Amino acid sequence: MKKIGLFGGTFDPIHNGHLHIARAFADEIGLDAVVFLPTGGPYHKDAASASAADRLAMVELATAEDARFAVSDCDIVREGATYTFDTVQIFRQQFPSAQLWWLMGSDSLMKLHTWKKWQMLVRETNIAVAMRQGDSLHQTPRELHAWLGKSLQDGSVRILSAPMHNVSSTEIRRAGVSDGIPPAAARYIREHGLYEK
């Protein structure tokens, strides 16, 4: 059975931490592919500072060297807010017999019960969680306790041994884009004058 990992994010910009956790995701779960899904209009984040087209181009450039990585614009071309459940449905239709895995950080796990159709989502896809420094499963909201306990036991939720890097795209933009960005994406940023102060 084919195993496909889905990795959504604003990727504004994509950085080495994203690539590191995507490789760990692929290695630890034994994925055939990791599909990066730059968001169009995420309902739970502030507007991105680079256009969707620029973010898509940067992700394509940054992921080109790993044959396991693919990029989809499905969340960009959809009109309106994009929800994870809808994205997973698109991949479920394209790959009906594949085992789907959704990658999220522990910060997202703590808010999962607020996501649109979260209970249906977790029936459609397995979840891989990258823990952020300082986060603990003991902090999980009460609304998720029963589901998380069962899911950790049956293997439909896996905690990755590789931690999330404590660097964010926001910090990279504030500090000035240079370190921590894959070279091809950094070149694109310079050539297109993105994130200039």
From Swiss-Prot:
InterPro entries: Cyt_trans-like, NadD/NMNAT, Rossmann-like_a/b/a_fold. It holds the Pfam family CTP_transf_like. Its EC number is 2.7.7.18. Pathway: Cofactor biosynthesis; NAD(+) biosynthesis; deamido-NAD(+) from nicotinate D-ribonucleotide: step 1/1. Keywords: ATP-binding, NAD, Nucleotide-binding, Nucleotidyltransferase, Pyridine nucleotide biosynthesis, Transferase. One of its GO terms (molecular function) is nicotinate-nucleotide adenylyltransferase activity. Belongs to the NadD family. NCBIfam families: cyt_tran_rel, nicotinate (nicotinamide) nucleotide adenylyltransferase, PRK00071.1-3. This is Probable nicotinate-nucleotide adenylyltransferase. The gene is nadD.
